[in-house]
């Protein structure tokens, strides 16, 4: 009879460890052995005995009923039937009882020899190919050479059948009768048995020392790496020594999972649907049994070997069918789903069942708008509410004595009798519901509402919640969930209620902003109209003004004077006379008086600021009421205003025809220039595109002027646009201007989208011609396709971000770091992208900040920078502030509140336990989806702003140049000018009086300069201009040109133009690396002055032998302009940065400051040598096809690119250090989002970047337990170095019994030992100081970082499940359940917010319960006192 035990796992465990299962453990957890491949009897539908569904092993199929039916009912619980051997118990044990299969021969576990890195292979030092040939019974392996060692046969040698038999023949007779542990015995085996023996014989410590020695001393880098890889596996086994033995990677007993987890369901028609696992198990059992029989009947070796191989393969398929080249397929040619497959992927155990479960007490329905709802309310259909709150209703029915039993109460609820409705009303009071709209992209995708019962079957949603849910009412559905426990209800009410979530956690701006109709109504009544009825009247107060309006004496738009309540500069409410309108008076009736009098026209933008102010001044509760008032007024006025629009409101400007004609004329001129041969085809194209872009933008401007002055700006279309209710300038332009340039169709794999040079001149009001329509359909369709594809990408980005940062939680108040980031205005050339105010607001200052002129303390170090302080700092001359940042936070786990700063969703300092990592990931991911969904609105219109190609003085100033090298020329107008030939030239505009630098500009190579250093210039003076369409190469000397290596069809091709017959020489990539195209400039006597390399793609515009003057252009390299700028470029860019990928054409970057000299040409690469002042020399190879950006004798700074291309984050990290790369990534990603007009606070990006920089790579392990090149956590690294700090390493143990060479001992132990030896006159122990490890900071992409987390559960549920579990098992890892995902998987509360471990003991209840408990407590106390 199989043995039974009750081993129920407790659910309050605090960690999970994973390891290899030993055969004993598998037996221990098994309830019996499965002997037969049968599943169930096809006639009786009862499980076969000893089969895969056997009731003896796994438990009964029906509750409390044995197989033969002798014992039925619960009273026999626990009895084992004497006839059929089935224990009488409940049927759910079939979900937890395991079985096992005892294999006749051991089998290797596929995870450990088929997945990379090959664990068994690394341990034994055998390559995968050889290992496979042993495991699959093709070769013998020598386990112990014994007497044959002198014949040159060594351990681990592979033998073929013949060789093996030869050796057996030549062995001494008695050899095979020796004991296995006799060193003379020759042993060779094949299959997993052989591997088992080899693994069992390993001495890990000796192997470890040998490999460490090899890794330290081997000259060949490849062998060194090999040794390090093997070391990692060896070290894993040494570290987990108690739990894991290498030979357990060979399976002797296969566990059988419980039958309910691999069900067999009868379908109608006598067929069965079965889980694939049953098939896989059956194959294993059949082959195992056949092998048993064959061994019993002493079958020949060949047959046995074949059968063993088949057994190995069947177990492989069972464990991981997708890894095998020949996966087991079903009849329908579908690979069977093995055990590994059921863990992997979106449908696997982790993501399908552990991280996302379906829940009870939920409902879903279509949503409709509920304009009469208050903030924080929602309408729930009666039927839905009755079903959701059913248990609560039943309880009340019984309490009120309406029914006696639960069953009858249930019936009443199901029949929906009248009595339940008022009970339901009562139950719903103070019991909020959660509404959720998929996709839940950020935390505002689930909010709590107080439900109201409504008729109908649709859920009513508050219109202001739409933005947060990204919902509209075109058929969206939402899910409703009911929080059940007191704790959950409390959290829903306090933390998740809609009216408490007015601010967007991504940027702190209000998210419940009225949109569309509401904005339009408010805009309409706050707009003024000159000449309206009652203009210029004066009223003594708002009441009088309203009476006059109601009596029809004054128009709602008329400018009038009214005495209203406003707030003066000290914040007191005073009565003042304001020039305003009745509409504005009506609006201000709703605005809380503390917020002042709003006397502007209200658009969506200004409304957002007003709401922000109201929240700041009056708090969230008042703000919610204010929002409700605004909503009602907006809807009412949009209705009263009758704001429809008709075709006549779309006005086409009269100037359109002349503008278009002007465009045609200019294009004609450009084409003439081209035909005359003045410009190349590419330039012609760029200029044409430029002309049309200009025409389009000019037309847009005229159109805006026209439409905004129509009917004093009361044109409906203009009102919609201007208020921000609907539509954009783009769309209006296409309706009544011209559609403009469109992107060209793009072939797969071609260069980015070119632009069609004939624009669409019609607009939608005039209608498009067939051709125009056809061109524009392409853009529109591309938009739709992009949207569909990019949504998935954005979702995947969010998933990776959450995975990398889910364990970042605020763990402490202050980590006490002294470091921070220096913040300044973020500028691009001279326009401020982000002001200092925005960047420091809500952060914590590192130092005291003192006003430089007045000397007052603005903010103390370690204090929050509030709005007032930030404003003062912005207005003062202070240019940079050092703030605390999560990038520099030194908290051991998570981050500290001071380094994070203000929680944007509440505008207060962040609290301990806030899950800032997840908030950051959502804040970055959510707009990612928005961005991608935004492509198609412009209908594929090519949005490219005309390239600006000059520097013009913005104000009068003095010029200062840096690194300027020029050549004097005469420009095309005949004026004297200079051409810049230095690559690093910069011009600074300096204020003449104060000497403050106003702005700094880069002066590009090849630009024409019209001023000199130190000049005073007036505002509007042209400083420099350059060719925006071409990069150029300019000669710096006068002389004769001679080409070298310029060979037709080898290094250049000729493109002749059909239209003009002009021929152009274009440099191409040469197959022959010895031929390097270059241009020499020679003197009259033929002496070489300069040489210029000709880069690939350059158009040579000078003939061979031609004379050139200094400053002339010899090569033009067309820049790729006129690409359609889509976020399609944006999302991949964000991914590229977060994954820390190197761009496709990385620039070569100088690592030191120094002087440049050009070296020789080696294999198609030019050598560039940088020599620093200290004499350090660095050599770089730059492919000749690239343009080299430095010249002989230039002085370059570290980090300067030497060739064109993008700088890689890895280079920035290596050269400029961690801070620089962190700022680089944050700013680069911010740029992508800014381009789309999406505001996200820097701190969110900082959290992700912090997670990317968690690890260091060991350079020199010293005496620590690390290996060279190992990647470890920064913290772990510091702890390990602290551990050996001050300790000694034994060099020579002398006569000591207790110490070995290489042992690490404390100074005290050493002193004791040595004094003992000294007393006995023995040789003392010699030591040296322990050497600490050194490391380099590395930057990991978010995917790498997520897979490298300390929690294996989190990593396994992210990606590469099998690989992660595999590694974790070998290392015997323990998961301490510190992050979020691990805890969700284990069904625990997450360790953040109210789930923090210190709140575990708190119980939420009512006052009555508390009093009752206290009363009981008193009686007990009295009882004790009586004693």
UniProtKB/Swiss-Prot annotation:
Coiled coil regions in record: none
GO molecular function: DNA binding; DNA-directed RNA polymerase activity; magnesium ion binding; zinc ion binding
Annotated positions binding Zn(2+) 2: 815, 889, 896, 899
Keyword Kinase belongs to the record: no
Keywords attached to this entry: DNA-directed RNA polymerase, Magnesium, Metal-binding, Nucleotidyltransferase, Transcription, Transferase, Zinc
GO cellular component: DNA-directed RNA polymerase complex
Cofactor note (record): Binds 1 Mg(2+) ion per subunit. Binds 2 Zn(2+) ions per subunit.
Protein role: DNA-dependent RNA polymerase catalyzes the transcription of DNA into RNA using the four ribonucleoside triphosphates as substrates.
Complexes and interactors: The RNAP catalytic core consists of 2 alpha, 1 beta, 1 beta' and 1 omega subunit. When a sigma factor is associated with the core the holoenzyme is formed, which can initiate transcription.
Protein name (record): DNA-directed RNA polymerase subunit beta'
């Amino acid at each position: 009879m199989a043995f039974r035990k009750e081993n129920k796992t407790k659910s309050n465990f605090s960690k999970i460890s994973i390891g290899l299962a030993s055969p004993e453990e598998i037996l221990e957890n098994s309830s019996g052995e499965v002997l037969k491949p049968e599943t169930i009897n096809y006639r009786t539908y009862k499980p076969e005995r000893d089969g895969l569904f056997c009731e003896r092993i796994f438990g009964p199929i029906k509750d409390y009923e044995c197989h033969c039916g002798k014992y039925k009912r619960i009273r026999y619980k626990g009895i084992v039937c004497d006839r059929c051997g089935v224990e009488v118990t409940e049927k759910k044990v079939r979900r937890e009882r395991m079985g096992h299969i005892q294999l006749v021969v051991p089998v290797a576990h596929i995870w450990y020899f088929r997945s990379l890195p090959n664990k068994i292979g690394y341990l034994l030092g055998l390559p995968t190919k050889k290992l496979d040939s042993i495991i699959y019974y093709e070769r013998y392996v020598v386990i112990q050479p014994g007497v044959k060692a002198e014949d040159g046969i060594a351990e681990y040698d592979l033998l073929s059948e013949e060789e093996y038999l030869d050796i057996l023949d030549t062995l001494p007779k008695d050899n095979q009768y020796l004991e296995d542990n006799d060193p003379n015995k020759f042993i060779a085996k094949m299959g997993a048995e052989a591997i088992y023996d080899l693994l069992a014989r390993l001495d890990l410590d000796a192997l470890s020392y040998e490999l460490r020695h090899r890794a330290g001393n081997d000259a060949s880098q490849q062998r060194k790496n090999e040794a390090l890889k093997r070391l990692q596996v060896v070290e894993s086994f040494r570290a987990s020594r108690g739990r894991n033995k290498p030979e357990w990677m060979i399976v002797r007993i296969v566990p059988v999972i419980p039958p309910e987890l691999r069900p067999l369901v009868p379908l109608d028609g006598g067929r069965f649907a079965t889980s694939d696992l049953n098939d896989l198990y059956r194959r294993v059992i059949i082959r195992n049994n056949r092998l048993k029989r064959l061994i019993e009947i002493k079958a020949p070796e060949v047959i046995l070997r074949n059968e063993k191989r088949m057994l190995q393969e069947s177990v492989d398929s069972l464990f991981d069918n997708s890894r095998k080249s020949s996966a087991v397929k079903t009849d329908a040619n579908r690979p069977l789903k093995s055990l590994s497959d059921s863990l992997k992927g979106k449908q696997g155990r982790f993501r399908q069942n552990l991280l996302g479960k379906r829940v009870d007490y939920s409902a879903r329905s279509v949503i409709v708008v509920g304009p009469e709802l208050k903030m924080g309310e929602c309408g729930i259909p009666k039927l839905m509410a009755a079903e959701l709150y059913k248990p609560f209703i039943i309880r009340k029915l019984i309490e009120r004595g309406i029914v006696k039993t639960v069953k009858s109460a249930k019936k009443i609820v199901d029949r929906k009798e009248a009595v339940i409705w008022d009970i339901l009303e009562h139950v719903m009071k103070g019991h909020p519901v959660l509404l959720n709209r998929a996709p839940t992209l950020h935390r505002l995708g689930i909010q709590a509402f107080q439900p109201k019962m409504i008729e109908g079957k649709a859920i009513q949603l508050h219109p202001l919640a739409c933005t947060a849910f990204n919902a509209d009412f075109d058929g969206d559905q939402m899910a409703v969930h009911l929080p059940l426990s007191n704790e959950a209800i409390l959290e829903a009410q306090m933390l998740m209620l809609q009216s408490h979530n007015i601010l967007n956690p991504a940027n702190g701006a209000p998210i419940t902003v009225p949109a569309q109709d509401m904005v339009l109504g408010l805009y309409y009544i706050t707009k003024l109209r000159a000449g309206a009825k009652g203009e210029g009247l004066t009223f003594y107060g708002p009441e009088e003004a309203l009476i006059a309006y109601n009596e029809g004496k004054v128009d709602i738009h008329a400018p009038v004077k009214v005495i209203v309540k406003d707030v003066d500069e000290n914040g007191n409410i005073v009565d003042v006379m304001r020039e305003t309108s009745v509409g504005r008076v009506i609006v201000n009736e709703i605005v809380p008086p503390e917020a002042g009098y709003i006397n502007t026209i209200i658009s969506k933008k200004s409304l957002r600021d007003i709401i922000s102010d109201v929240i700041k001044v009056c708090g969230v509760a008042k703000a919610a009421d204010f929002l409700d008032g605004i909503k009602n007024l907006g809807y009412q006025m949009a209705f009263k205003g009758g704001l429809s629009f008709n075709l006549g409101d779309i006005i086409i400007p009269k100037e359109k025809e002349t503008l278009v004609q002007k465009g045609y004329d200019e294009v004609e001129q450009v084409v003439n220039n081209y035909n005359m041969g003045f410009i190349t085809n590419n330039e012609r194209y760029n200029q044409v595109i430029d002309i049309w872009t200009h025409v389009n933008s000019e037309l847009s401007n005229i159109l805006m002027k026209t439409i905004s002055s129509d009917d004093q700006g009361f044109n409906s279309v203009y009102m919609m646009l201007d208020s921000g209710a609907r539509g954009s300038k783009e769309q209006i332009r296409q309706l009544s201007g011209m559609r403009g340039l469109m992107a060209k169709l793009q072939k797969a794999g071609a260069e980015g989208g070119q632009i069609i040079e004939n624009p669409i001149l019609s607009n939608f009001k005039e209608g498009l011609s067939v051709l125009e329509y056809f061109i524009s359909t392409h853009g529109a369709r591309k938009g739709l396709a992009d949207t569909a594809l990019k949504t998935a990408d954005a979702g995947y980005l969010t998933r990776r971000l959450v995975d990398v940062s889910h364990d970042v939680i605020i763990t402490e108040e202050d980590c006490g770091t002294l470091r921070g980031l220096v913040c300044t205005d973020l500028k691009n050339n001279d326009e401020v992208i982000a002001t200092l105010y925005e960047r420091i607001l809500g952060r914590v200052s590192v130092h005291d900040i003192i006003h430089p002129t007045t000397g007052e303390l603005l903010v103390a170090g370690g204090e929050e920078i509030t709005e007032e302080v930030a404003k003062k700092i912005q207005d003062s001359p202070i240019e940079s502030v050092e703030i605390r940042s999560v990038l520099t936070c030194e908290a051991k786990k998570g981050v500290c509140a001071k380094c994070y700063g203000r929680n944007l969703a509440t505008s207060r300092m962040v609290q301990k336990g806030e899950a800032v990592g997840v908030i950051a990931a959502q804040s970055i991911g959510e707009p990612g989806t928005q961005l991608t969904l935004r492509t198609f609105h412009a209908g594929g219109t090519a949005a490219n702003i005309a390239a600006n190609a000059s520097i013009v003085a913005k104000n009068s100033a003095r010029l200062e140049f840096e690194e300027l090298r020029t050549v004097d020329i005469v420009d095309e107008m005949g004026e004297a000018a200079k051409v810049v030939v230095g690559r690093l030239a910069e011009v600074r505009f300096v204020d003449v009086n104060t000497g403050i630098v106003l702005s700094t500009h880069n002066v590009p190579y090849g630009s024409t300069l019209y001023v000199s250093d130190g000049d005073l210039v007036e505002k509007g003076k042209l400083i420099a201009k350059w060719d925006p369409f071409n990069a150029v190469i300019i000669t710096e000397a006068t002389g004769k040109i001679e080409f070298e290596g310029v060979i037709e069809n080898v290094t250049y091709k000729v493109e002749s133009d059909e239209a003009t017959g002009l021929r152009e020489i274009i440099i191409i990539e040469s197959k022959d690396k010895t031929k390097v195209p270059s241009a020499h400039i020679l003197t009259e006597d033929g002496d070489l002055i300069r040489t210029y390399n000709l880069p690939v793609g350059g158009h040579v515009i000078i003939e061979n032998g031609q004379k050139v003057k200094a400053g002339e252009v010899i090569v033009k390299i067309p820049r790729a302009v006129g690409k359609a700028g889509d976020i399609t470029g944006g999302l991949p860019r964000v991914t590229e940065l977060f994954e820390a990928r190197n761009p496709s054409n990385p620039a070569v970057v100088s690592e030191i400051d120094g002087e440049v000299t050009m070296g020789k040409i080696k294999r198609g690469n030019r050598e560039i040598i940088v020599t620093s002042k200290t004499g350090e020399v660095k050599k770089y190879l730059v492919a000749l096809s690239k343009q080299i950006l430095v010249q002989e004798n230039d002085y370059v700074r570290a980090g300067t690119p030497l060739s064109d291309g993008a700088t890689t984050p890895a280079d920035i990290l290596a050269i400029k250090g961690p801070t620089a790369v962190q700022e680089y990534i944050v700013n680069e990603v911010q740029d992508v989002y800014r381009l789309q007009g999406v505001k996200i606070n820097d701190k969110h990006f900082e959290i992700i970047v912090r997670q990317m920089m968690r690890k260091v790579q060991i350079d020199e392990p010293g005496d620590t337990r690390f290996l060279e090149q190992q990647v470890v956590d920064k913290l772990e690294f510091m702890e390990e170095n602290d551990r050996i700090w001050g300790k000694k390493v034994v060099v020579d143990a002398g006569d000591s019994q207790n110490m070995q060479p290489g042992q690490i001992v404390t100074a005290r132990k050493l002193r004791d030992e040595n004094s003992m030896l000294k007393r006995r006159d023995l040789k003392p122990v010699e030591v040296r100081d322990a050497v600490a490890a050194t490391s380099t900071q590395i930057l990991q992409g978010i995917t790498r970082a997520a897979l490298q987390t300390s929690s294996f559960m989190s990593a396994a549920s992210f990606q590469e499940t099998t690989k992660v579990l595999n590694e974790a098992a070998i290392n015997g890892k323990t998961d301490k359940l510190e992050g979020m995902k691990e805890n969700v998987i284990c069904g625990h509360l997450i360790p953040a917010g109210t789930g923090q471990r210190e709140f575990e003991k708190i119980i939420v209840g009512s006052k009555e319960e508390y009093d009752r408990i206290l009363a009981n407590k008193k009686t007990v106390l009295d009882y004790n006192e009586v004693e």
